[in-house]
């Protein structure tokens, strides 16, 4: 692997370092491992450490060095070992053979730009703040500083070395302006370097400059450039630098300020700093509906079958990994690929230009010849990673997969360790993505229920719920110390976790034993120690601490070990307190044959009429609807709630609301709810081959285990998606798994969909819950929604996995209710499969303690380990054939479901994209031009597609691809399906508080700030074009009027005529057809007005302005509206709108464009306002 961080060496020999990182090395004793350091620690000493133990892991070496240098446990995971000779980073579990001479380098590998907060244009980076501080708008209160003092010092020394060894090189610059800028910045960096030395040694700056030449503090390429000048030029440069030093008085600067300025300038000067670029021999983005990247080739594949030949040859693509930008990739140019991407040079290519750091979705190039970067994912989107030899699969929660083939197995391990490290730092500190790079200490911690080095407020939050809780954690200050923490509740502080007084008892690690200080007994494992402590009490002085229950680490816990990068609204769980689903009219459905009974429901096959009158064909060969009504007919399943159970209709609707707000290819699609007289009907998709348990029983003894494991993987994928959203299915079992594709033919895989749970657990009687044993989790027998959690679904998954293994026969099915209940009471174990690996997996899922059950990410990771032929099947195609483009959609596979809405020139509809025509498609939103559009509109349509394909932001609707029809010469835009529709349609029908409206407004500003940063103006920002993904997340859509602002210009002048949303336009747009960035701010003000009026049609901008100007048409409307706005008339204050919010609207409606705030300015203002009104009832709002 080629890391962009150059190699490190001794500070004493920096002046002789080469640009490629190869420098003179200290003499290595024979049979010894030497690790070189950038900084030896506060005590000084030699900048290297030697090891002579027989066998060590890379993690053990890092821990030893961190202890020597003074790096604290929370920062340990930022560091790793680099092998200069092999040019790879070592994964933490790599076993080092110290019998051979070896030089390694201890470096900070995991880096997050703007961790110092000096650049307001980039996301703030900080560790998660203390519980209860999230509502603060002050970053200092919001989060914890990323680095400790030793890590900061080490990074500074590492950054100095990288700068002087040409992480950004003068040789890569071409224009005089770039060279001049580089020289000035380099001299400034040299000044900061000398300032730091002077402050640390306590000597005057001029004296330090006489002792150390500034040329020793600038890049190697700059030094060589200076040597080429004549003596007079060099002397003049020395004098200029010394005059600058004499004129400057650094008394107000501290060492810390100097170090921060140095690193912040280095980030700006060298965009590659802190990133890694990895050349790969082969890259594919796999969309699972087209090519299922599972790990069996066909149903007859055996574990011993060899995999396909791995691609070889020069690199074809390059992958970019950064802490703030996630994973991106681009193809390599031919000449670069032929050179192997300069693999012998640890820097790769360099650039002295100053582009922004790559962020999610940005297509950034460092040179005009370099292809743009394509965004793949952020680390928290990853579900699991599979590594086999040189091939890596990165699987996402939405089932997309990145397939990479690296140049060597060592590079593959290095790359996976990089992705895994960033995942643990940003998503889940107690989970690893891949066994092959699992940190040994983390594996031990998971096995023994040990928390990471949590700070006290997070410990207090975990111990607060009840008395008798305790936890075991790694110390926050000592790398080799474990601590048992208990809490004493202080009656004087009873309102929160801060009222707990913590007491810590160290646990000493001895060879093969653990000893709790103050207790003479030793234990072979922490599990044995926990078992012995159960029910005991610890006494310290006059205090007595009962130990009833040990708090174990949980998936995705928020703590100081998780690093936040700006606002992450999409991590908030869905709020299901308000029902939301599509209503199906009773005339649109036809009830057909009865399929059976569910819990309090009757299930029928049916037909759902969708589409317009020109689509009168019938899907899947079904007969047309009686009466001859036109439109396409879809086969559906009708789940009819028995009218006698009208008392649980709300629970029935809650199920429909849950399934309507989620979208995953392995979840059955819910079309909506129909009320037919006294009947309540859920209308869901029809899946061809029906329930899995019935099919398995029919095929008893004929289905191979590999087939079953693919099904298990797909089920775990769907449940992992729900777990990430903190949603509980509550009824995972074989009868609710529907088989869409059999996958028995060679080259195919099965495809399943998890159906809706039916009537929710909370509405079931105890008898019904007992009847569902063994799928019902033990904690759910008592009833109530408080017992429902994601661990409930894990128990159901374990029981279903047994059901799949046993050909559809579930355990305990022959027993009566009392026997089943007694089975749970006695905590008996369900029967296990004969495979030891499968037995271990099901045992973990079916533990009676919910906190001890693993996460679905863990299950997905471990399921891949059960299949030795990991890569077989994903590459069972001609290696010479080009990879299919996942952004190309074919019209024949698009099945229309219903219309979603219309814009000025286009129409948006919901489609199912089903290329295999077997019910495995995904729901997408497709936008097409209306008929009769002229060439001018078609040209604008192409521009909209080109704009949207370059954007990637959490508050902008995602581009999926295009569908071209060569016959009709038309292009359809395919986007993600946003289930809840536009704010214009949503707000009038739902009760939304002011704080939530302000959150929407803040998110709109964040999306628009990103759009403006990409040099686009929207020109059609309105509530109708803001889509609601869930009740905490909005996305901007409809870029039909968007324009790119030419470089160096402040506005775009529109010359074409067309239908325009004039009531949302600023005066300069109406009068001069000039569209500034500030023109979008005006439109935002009108959009904010719409939000505060709840999109009431009687108070719409169109209605209000029409009342003021009278009914007019065409240009007369524009003329009168312009005159009205120039007189200072504005939309009135909405009812119950706070004064400061209406004042903010009026700021957005300033006549002079330059007086309006920017979206960047609006974000913190709205965030502060949102926090102010969070939790307040309407009566306390400060209205005018």
From Swiss-Prot:
Keywords: ATP-binding, Kinase, Nucleotide-binding, Phosphoprotein, Repeat, SH2 domain, Transferase, Tyrosine-protein kinase. Pfam families: FERM_F1, FERM_F2, Jak1_Phl, PK_Tyr_Ser-Thr, SH2_1. The modification Phosphoserine is found at residues 525, 881. Phosphorylation by JAK1 at Tyr-1051 and Tyr-1052 induces kinase activation. It comes from the Eukaryota. Residues 294-368 are annotated as: Disordered. Disruption phenotype: Deficient mice are viable and fertile but display multiple immunological defects, most prominently high sensitivity to infections and defective tumor surveillance. Absence of TYK2 results in increased resistance against allergic, autoimmune and inflammatory disease. The modification Phosphotyrosine is found at residues 295, 604, 1051-1052. It catalyses: L-tyrosyl-[protein] + ATP = O-phospho-L-tyrosyl-[protein] + ADP + H(+). One of its GO terms (biological process) is immune response. Its EC number is 2.7.10.2. InterPro entries: Band_41_domain, FERM_2, FERM_domain, FERM_F1, FERM_F2, JAK, JAK1-3/TYK2_PHL_dom, Kinase-like_dom_sf. It is an enzyme of class 2 (transferase). The active site is at residue 1020. Residues 449-529 form the SH2 domain. Belongs to the protein kinase superfamily. Tyr protein kinase family. JAK subfamily. Interacts (via FERM domain) with JAKMIP1. Interacts with PIK3R1; this interaction is important for cell migration. Interacts with MPL/TPOR. This is Non-receptor tyrosine-protein kinase TYK2. It comes from Mus musculus.
């Amino acid at each position: 692997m080629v890391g962009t961080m150059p190699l490190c060496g001794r500070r004493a020999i920096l002046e002789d370092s080469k640009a490629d990182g190869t420098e003179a090395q200290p003499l290595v004793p024979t049979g010894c491992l030497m690790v070189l350091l950038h900084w030896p620690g506060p005590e000084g000493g030699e900048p290297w450490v030697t090891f002579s133990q027989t066998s060590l892991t890379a993690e053990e070496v890092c821990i030893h060095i961190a202890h020597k240098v003074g790096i604290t446990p929370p920062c340990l995971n930022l560091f790793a070992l680099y092998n200069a000779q092999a040019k790879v980073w070592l994964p933490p579990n790599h076993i080092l053979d110290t019998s051979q001479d070896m030089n390694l380098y201890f470096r900070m590998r995991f880096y997050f730009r703007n961790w110092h907060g000096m650049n307001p244009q980039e996301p703030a980076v900080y560790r998660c703040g203390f519980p209860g501080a999230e509502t603060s708008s002050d970053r200092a209160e919001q989060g914890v500083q990323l680095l400790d003092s030793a890590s900061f010092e080490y990074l500074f020394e590492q950054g100095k070395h990288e700068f002087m060894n040409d992480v950004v090189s003068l040789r890569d610059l071409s224009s005089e302006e770039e060279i001049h800028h580089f020289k000035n910045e380099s001299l400034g960096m040299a000044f900061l370097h000398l300032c730091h030395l002077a402050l640390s040694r306590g000597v005057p700056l001029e004296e330090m400059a006489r002792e150390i030449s500034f040329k020793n503090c600038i890049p190697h390429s700059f030094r060589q450039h200076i040597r080429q000048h004549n003596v007079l030029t060099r002397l003049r440069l020395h004098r200029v630098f010394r005059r600058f030093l004499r004129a400057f008085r650094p008394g107000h600067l501290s060492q810390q300020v100097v170090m921060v300025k140095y690193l912040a300038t280095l980030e700006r000067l060298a965009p590659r700093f802190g990133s890694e670029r990895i050349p790969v021999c082969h890259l594919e983005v796999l969309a699972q509906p087209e090519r299922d990247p599972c790990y069996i080739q066909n149903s007859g594949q055996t574990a011993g079958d060899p995999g396909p030949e791995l691609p070889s040859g020069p690199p074809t693509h390059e992958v970019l990994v950064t802490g703030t930008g996630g994973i991106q990739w681009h193809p390599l140019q031919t000449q670069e690929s032929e050179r192997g991407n300069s693999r012998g040079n640890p820097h790769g290519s360099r650039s002295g230009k100053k582009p922004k750091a790559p962020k999610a979705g940005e297509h950034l190039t460092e040179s005009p010849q370099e292809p743009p970067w394509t965004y793949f994912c952020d680390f928290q989107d990853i579900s699991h990673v599979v590594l086999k030899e040189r091939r890596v699969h990165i699987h996402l929660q939405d089932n997309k997969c990145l397939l990479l083939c690296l140049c060597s197995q060592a590079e593959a391990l290095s790359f996976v360790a990089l992705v895994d490290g960033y995942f643990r730092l940003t998503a889940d500190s107690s989970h690893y993505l891949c066994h092959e790079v699992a940190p040994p200490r983390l594996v031990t911690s998971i096995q023994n229920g040990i928390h990471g080095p949590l700070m006290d407020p997070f410990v207090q939050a975990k111990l607060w719920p009840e008395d008798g809780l305790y936890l075991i954690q790694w110390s926050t200050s000592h790398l080799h110390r474990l601590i048992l923490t208990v809490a004493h509740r202080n009656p004087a502080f009873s309102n929160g976790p801060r009222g707990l007084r913590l007491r810590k008892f160290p646990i000493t690690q001895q060879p093969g034993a653990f000893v709790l200080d103050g207790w003479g007994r030793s234990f072979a494992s922490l599990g044995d120690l926990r078992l012995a402590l159960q029910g005991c009490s610890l006494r310290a002085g006059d205090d007595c601490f009962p130990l009833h229950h040990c708090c174990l680490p949980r998936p995705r816990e928020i703590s100081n070990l998780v690093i936040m990068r700006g606002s992450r609204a999409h991590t908030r769980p869905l709020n299901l307190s308000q029902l939301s689903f599509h209503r199906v009219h009773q005339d649109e459905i036809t009830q057909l044959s009865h399929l059976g009974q569910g819990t309090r429901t009757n299930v029928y096959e049916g037909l759902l009429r969708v589409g317009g009158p020109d689509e009168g064909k019938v899907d899947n060969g079904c007969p047309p609807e009686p009466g001859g009504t036109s439109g396409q007919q879809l086969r559906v399943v009708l789940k009819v709630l028995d009218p006698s159970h009208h008392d649980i209709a709300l629970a029935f609707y809650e199920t429909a609301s849950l399934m309507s707000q989620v979208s995953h290819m392995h979840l059955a699609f819910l079309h909506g709810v129909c009320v037919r007289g006294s009947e309540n009907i859920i209308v869901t998709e029809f899946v061809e081959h029906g329930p899995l348990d019935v099919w398995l029983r029919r095929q008893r003894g004929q289905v191979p285990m590999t087939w079953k494991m693919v099904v298990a993987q797909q089920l775990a994928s769907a449940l992992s998606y729900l777990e990430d959203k903190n949603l509980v299915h509550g009824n995972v079992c074989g009868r609710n798994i529907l088989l869409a594709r059999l996958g028995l033919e060679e080259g195919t895989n099965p495809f399943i969909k998890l159906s809706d749970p039916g009537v929710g657990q909370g509405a079931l009687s105890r008898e019904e819950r007992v009847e569902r044993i063994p799928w019902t989790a033990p904690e759910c027998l008592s009833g109530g929604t408080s017992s429902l959690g994601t661990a409930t679904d894990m128990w159901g998954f374990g029981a279903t996995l047994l059901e799949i293994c046993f050909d559809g026969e579930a355990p305990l099915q022959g027993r009566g209710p009392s026997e089943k209940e007694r089975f749970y009471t006695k905590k008996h174990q369900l029967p296990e499969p004969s495979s030891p690996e499968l037995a271990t997996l099901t045992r973990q899922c079916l533990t009676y303690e919910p906190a001890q059950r693993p996460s679905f990410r863990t299950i997905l990771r471990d399921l891949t380990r059960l299949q030795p032929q990991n890569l077989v099947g994903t590459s069972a195609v001609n290696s010479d054939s080009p990879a299919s483009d996942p952004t190309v959609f074919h019209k024949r596979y698009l099945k229309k479901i219903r219309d979603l809405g219309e814009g000025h020139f286009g129409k948006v509809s919901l489609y199912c994209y089903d290329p295999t025509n077997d019910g495995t498609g995904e729901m997408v939103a497709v936008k097409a031009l209306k008929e009769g559009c002229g060439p001018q509109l078609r040209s604008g349509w192409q521009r909209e597609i080109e704009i949207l394909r370059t954007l990637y932001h959490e508050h902008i609707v995602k581009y999926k691809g295009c569908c071209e029809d060569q016959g009709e010469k038309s292009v359809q835009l395919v986007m993600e399906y946003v289930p809840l529709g536009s704010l214009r349609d949503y707000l009038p029908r739902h009760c939304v508080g002011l704080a939530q409206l302000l959150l929407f407004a803040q998110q709109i500003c964040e999306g628009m700030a990103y759009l403006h940063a990409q040099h686009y103006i929207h020109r059609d920002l309105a509530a109708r074009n803001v889509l609601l993904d869930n009740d905490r997340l909005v996305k901007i859509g409809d870029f039909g009027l968007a324009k790119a602002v030419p470089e160096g210009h402040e506005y775009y002048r529109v010359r074409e005529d067309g239908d325009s949303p004039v009531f949302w336009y600023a005066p300069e747009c109406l009068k001069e057809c000039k569209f500034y960035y500030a023109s979008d701010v005006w439109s935002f003000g009108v959009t904010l007005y719409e939000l505060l009026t709840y999109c009431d049609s009687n108070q719409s901008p169109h209605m209000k302005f029409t009342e003021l100007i009278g009914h007019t048409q065409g240009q007369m409307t524009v003329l009168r509206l312009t005159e009205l706005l120039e007189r200072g008339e504005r939309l009135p204050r909405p009812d119950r709108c706070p004064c400061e919010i209406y004042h903010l609207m009026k700021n957005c409606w300033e006549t002079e464009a330059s007086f309006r705030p920017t979206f960047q300015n609006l974000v913190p203002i709205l965030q502060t306002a949102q926090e102010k009104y969070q939790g307040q009832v309407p009566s306390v709002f400060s209205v005018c």
